[in-house]
Amino acid sequence: MLESKPMKVIFALFTSALLASLVFAQSPAQKIYDTERAFEKAVAEKGINSGFIEYLSADGLIFNPEAQNGREAWKNRPPSPASLTWNPIWIEVSSNGALAYSIGNGIYQPKGKDDTTQYFTHYLSIWSRQPNGEYKAVLDAGINHPKPATIPTEWKSPPVSGNEKVLNSAGDHAVPFYTMVETDGVVKAYKTFLADDAFLMRDGNVPYFGKAAALSYLESTKPAIKFSKRKTFLEAGDLAWVSSLYSIVDRSGKETERGNFVQVWKLRNGKWQIAADLFLPIPPKGQ
């Protein structure tokens, strides 16, 4: 039996409303994941330069090795045949959906997807929701390390993500961490402020996931760290991120390493905690 025209109109309206509700119901974490996959596809189809220019925000940062505008940096690089593939494995979104971060693993092949030379990486991306509802990366940073024992492809999002009531600022409550680093040492400071599900990311090492693993690494190295005053800080709901410079000094006070650090802070059980902590050294001049 043929449908009448009014019935077709009603069905079309119902279908449109259903599709709209499904889009609206999409979780922010899922949207970040989908954005990551679209980003990776753009890199594969258009090249690394164009892909990053498209998905970095206008003021997005990269470390090259100093902090600089990511879009401008990629515009000034010559075209590259390199292949870059990745898997987001951890996504957390602020309570108001305005800010998010993702962590994942990646493989870089300088001469393209058939290149037998492979570099293994982990990255940290910070995402900011744009006026049109889409997300752009305001920071993209990564570390290199030997080939890991496994390369996960599934992603997770903390079950408590986005459920915290914000009563105080990360900017104020992070200060005691930096003070404690100076007065009581790195291990005690991180033991006090690291989240149980934190990622500690250090160049040359596969990331340490979880407070216990991170503290074990810090206790074995016991670095004397000096943090510079923050250069970049952004807070939205129960999530915040900060970036600046750090230096590591030996017992005589001589600087042995200098670089950029990024920290993601999240509010859990009324306390701001470090969710991700990345150090990326700046090579000494001449290297």
Locate the predicted segments by residue.
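A solvent-exposed, acidic/Ser-Thr-rich amphipathic alpha-helical stretch
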Residues: 29-33, 47-98, 187-238, 255
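Bacterial Sec-dependent N-terminal signal peptides
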Residues: 1-31
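Short beta-strand edge/turn micro-motifs at domain boundaries
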Residues: 118-155, 260-283
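Generic short beta-strand segments
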Residues: 58-59, 103-109, 243-249
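Short, low-complexity N-terminal intrinsically disordered segments enriched in polar/charged residues
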Residues: 24-49, 53-54, 136-138, 145-187, ...
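Short, structured motif recognition centered on aromatic/hydrophobic residues
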Residues: 39, 99-103, 124-127, 135-136, ...
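Hydrophilic extracytoplasmic domains
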Residues: 224, 232, 238-287
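Hydrophobic/aromatic beta-strand elements that line small-molecule binding cavities or substrate pockets
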Residues: 74-75, 88-93, 106-108, 122-129, ...
